[in-house]
UniProtKB/Swiss-Prot annotation:
A lipid is attached at residue 2 (N-myristoyl glycine). Residues 116-211, 425-529 are annotated as: Disordered. The keyword RNA-binding applies. Residues 157-167 have a biased composition (Low complexity). Residues 429-467 form a coiled coil. It comes from Duplan murine leukemia virus. The record marks 129-130, 206-207, 469-470 as: Cleavage. A zinc finger (CCHC-type) spans 493-510. GO terms for biological process: virion assembly. Residues 187-196, 425-457, 477-490, 498-510 have a biased composition (Basic and acidic residues). One of its GO terms (molecular function) is RNA binding. The lineage of its organism: Viruses, Riboviria, Pararnavirae, Artverviricota, Revtraviricetes. A motif (PPXY motif) lies at residues 176-179. The keyword Zinc-finger applies. This is Gag polyprotein.
Length: 529
């Protein structure tokens, strides 16, 4: 028999075109990325039982829908199209969803008189679904001989469980189930072995549950439960928060005994991890004064390392088990905390396509894991808010820093503002268009600047040429004017010095006589000078 593990989330992603058609029929539009984010990050944080891998349980879907459509600041209107589409998948399931949707139970009164046919699929409440390729076993005769009356094992009173006062607790194996399990995960919800009553609203999926005669009956973990829990979750060292949440849900819903807790820890944790968890749990034991105690008798009484003789049939034994589970959870939380390392908290930054809510959850998880501080503590809200602003995406962080009256803003206010900024981000197509437009504008400005510089250069060259031409023309005009002013012609007996007639210049009485002074010598510059 071959099998492949799938989940409601992966199932919807494999049939994404069908999901979009269903959303279109609801007059809404859904995006694949936000579908995954809401299913695996947002809705599990509502604390209504929504698993990380999605579910087709209508009750859980309606609880998430009530949270999403809540009026006022606590609502999430951007998530309405997605939860409405989830709801439509259950109300009008396509063929690939029908095997995983809970059918309406048949009345028990009609069962004793009808021969049992092929095993019907019981309501599926598991986080994971396994698609099996069933083999066809040979049919065997299941009716009593001679047409005798059928006995409904589900309504028959179970045998009394003798009260246990001392000695080891004896585990009783369950009677043969009425339904054959459709997948290995079925035994996670043990209520499938008993069809729910019409007026029943509480789950019966407990290892310890009330039998027909008022006695508690014990149903141990199945190997398929432990196998799937171990293989579908990260190790405690890799992600202590996720594994702690799984164990917490198992302790809450299954109400395991001391032996079950040891089996659970031995399967999901390594030997070193288990010892660390047990040590932290024993440190959390409190004395009569409400303070942590180290008295061996009180520690061993509340959290024993050896198998105790607690009788789950008595109120005292059940109280011991409740306290033991609480201490075990405290040990898991304390052991999951790493040494204080604020540098690792600062490395948590918002991804390019990560929503602010998802980023805040990762940031809080880093605070829980790498610091001793509780991010939910009101006294730490300022530190978490500053980390949220500084480590957000650059465009979101810049706008958050410019908010008016930033000091009075709560962490919830900052997340809402960041969501608005995130939702108004441009799409990749818009970003490409903006970059193309900016490039064209930049190129246009560059061409205009080049043309302006060329025009300025031409004007400067024209001015220089005009000056040069003006100089040449002026020189030519002066030369022409100078050529016209020639010396006047002298007569034969006219003096060139005094311009009088009757003598020449050398005999001019008006010309000064006497020795000539030395001519001034013109100094020449040499290369040395």
């Amino acid at each position: 028999m071959g099998q492949t593990v799938t989940t409601p989330l992966s199932l919807t992603l494999d049939h994404w075109k069908d999901v979009q058609c269903i959303a279109s029929n609801q007059s809404v539009d859904v995006k694949r990325r936000r579908w995954v984010t809401f299913c695996s990050v947002e809705w599990p944080s509502f604390d209504v039982g929504w698993p990380l891998d999605g579910t087709f349980n209508l009750d859980i879907i309606l609880q998430v829908k009530s949270k999403v459509t809540c009026p006022g600041p606590h609502g999430h209107p951007d998530q309405v199209p997605y939860i409405v589409t989830w709801e439509a998948l259950v109300y009008h399931p396509p063929p690939w969803v029908k095997p995983f949707v809970s059918p309406k139970p048949f009345p028990l009164s009609t069962l004793p008189f009808s021969p049992p046919g092929p095993s019907a699929h019981p309501p599926s409440r598991s986080d994971l679904y396994t698609a099996l390729i069933p083999s066809k076993p040979p049919k065997s005769r299941v009716l009593p001989p001679n047409g005798g009356p059928l006995i409904d094992l589900l309504t028959e009173n179970l045998p009394n469980l003798p009260p246990l006062s001392k000695g080891p607790v004896k585990k009783r194996r369950p009677p043969p189930p009425r339904y054959s399990p459709p997948n290995p995960m079925e035994s996670r919800v043990r209520g499938r072995r008993d069809p729910p009553a019409a007026d029943s609203t509480s789950s019966q999926a407990f290892p310890l549950r009330m039998g027909g005669d008022g006695q508690l009956q014990y149903w141990p973990f199945s190997s398929s439960d432990l196998y799937n829990w171990k293989n579908n979750n990260p190790s405690f060292s890799e992600d202590p928060g996720k594994l702690t949440a799984l164990i917490e849900s198992v302790l809450t819903t299954h109400q395991p005994t001391w032996d079950d807790c040891q089996q659970l820890l031995g399967t999901l944790l390594t030997g070193e991890e288990k010892q660390r968890v047990l040590l932290e749990a024993r440190k959390a034991v409190r004395g009569n004064d409400g303070r942590p105690t180290q008295l061996p008798n009180e520690v061993n009484s509340a959290f024993p390392l050896e198998r105790p003789d607690w009788n789950y049939s008595t109120p005292e034994g059940r109280n011991h088990l409740v306290l033991y589970r609480q201490l075990l959870l405290a040990g898991l939380h304390n052991a999951g905390r790493s040494p204080t390392n604020l540098a690792k908290v600062k490395r948590i930054t918002q991804g390019p396509n990560e929503s602010p809510s998802a980023f805040l959850e990762r940031l809080k998880e880093a605070y829980r894991r790498y610091t001793p501080y509780d991010p939910e503590d009101p006294g730490q809200e300022t530190n978490v808010s500053m980390s949220f602003i500084w480590q957000s995406a650059p465009d979101i962080g810049r706008k958050l820093e410019r908010l008016e009256d930033l000091k009075s803003k709560t962490l919830g206010d900052l997340v809402r503002e960041a969501e608005k900024i995130f939702n108004k981000r441009e799409t990749p197509e818009e970003r490409e268009e903006r970059i193309r437009r900016e490039t064209e504008e930049k190129e246009e400005r560059r061409r205009a600047e080049d043309e302006q510089r060329e025009k300025e250069r031409d004007r400067r060259r024209h001015r220089e040429m005009s000056k040069f031409l003006a100089t040449v023309v002026t020189g030519q005009r002066q030369d022409r004017q100078g050529g016209e002013r020639r010396r006047p012609q002298l007569d034969e007996d006219q003096c060139a010095y005094c311009k009088e007639k009757g003598h020449w210049a050398k005999d001019c009485p008006k010309k000064p006589r006497g020795p000539r002074g030395p001519r001034p010598q013109t100094s020449l510059l040499t290369l040395g000078d």
